[in-house]
Amino acid sequence: HKAVEHILSTVQSGQDIALISDAGTPGISDPGYLLIRALKQAGVKVTCLPGPTAFVPALVMSGLPSDKFFFEGFLPHKKGRQTRLTEISQLPCTVIMYESPFRLQKCIEELILHCGEERLACIVREISKIHEQAVTASLSELLSQLNTAKIPQKGEIVILLGGKEKEKKVKKEHSIIV
């Protein structure tokens, strides 16, 4: 927060700044929004130039429905994680999450517990790089591929979870035996 105050005073003294990131678009799943909010509250004009954002190409490559989606970003590491996974498991749209390669397998295991083995999902890694990979399958198949190293647990990871399907109502036929 001290950096925000320093940058704000720099801008207010008449200097221009540029907010850049080596991890995608600033403000998407990072604290860059704090600076942007402070600048806007101070009446500073903020302009955004389009740039790399991992979740858009991941959504396209996944083949999952893209007409409606929910961007979660990084899940909480500890506090509230299981509650959040329960909430996410009930969403009827595609859910997009970022995950560390070191927590990828655990995350898929947790998704299986909350969503079931057959929920469709996709792991996309290393977008726009030489080892780019997008694997869409059931959660249980994705876990199997992680266990056999068909999906390396390296690089930048995007997990896309298919939405919860509406339960089909089954008509019950009643018969009376006399």
Segments and roles (model prediction):
Residues 9-11, 35-38, 62-67, 114-115, ...:
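Short, hinge-like loop/turn segments at secondary-structure boundaries
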Residues 25, 29, 75-78, 97-101, ...:
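Conserved phosphate/pyrophosphate-binding and hydrolysis machinery centered on Walker-type P-loop NTPases
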Residues 3, 24, 31, 81-84, ...:
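Helical mechanochemical/support elements of P-loop NTPase systems and associated helical scaffolds
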Residues 12-16, 93-178:
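A contiguous loop/helix-start segment that scaffolds small-molecule binding in enzyme catalytic cores
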Residues 34-91:
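Class I SAM-dependent methyltransferase SAM-binding "motif I" and its flanking Rossmann-like core
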Residues 26, 53-56, 129-130:
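Short gly/pro/ser/thr-enriched loop/turn and capping motifs at secondary-structure boundaries
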Residues 1-48:
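Class I S-adenosyl-L-methionine
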Residues 21, 48-51, 97, 123:
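General beta-strand structural signal in soluble alpha/beta enzymes
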